[in-house]
Amino acid sequence: MTGLTIDFHNIPGAMMRVLNAFTRRGLVIESVWCGPSGDHHRAHVLVDAQAITIEQTVRELESTVGVDGVAPLNESEEATLLRHAKQ
């Protein structure tokens, strides 16, 4: 599993564009959590994919309108998301 955190503007369609970056590549999203973070929103997404696919998805997200940044989740954040996904 790989976890990413994506910071984006709270504008119409922004979350849809973020999630579409994963679904266009045929990735199954295991878990997603989204909430406000200051004047932006932050999504934590957990997917099971090969490293090259994650790299391509990160590049696409970084060029997506409204996305400010993409970073990997640390292991404890990934474990928390996975635990919540299995409940």
Region spans (language model):
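A conserved regulatory-domain signal marking ACT and ACT-like small-molecule sensing domains
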Residues: 1-87
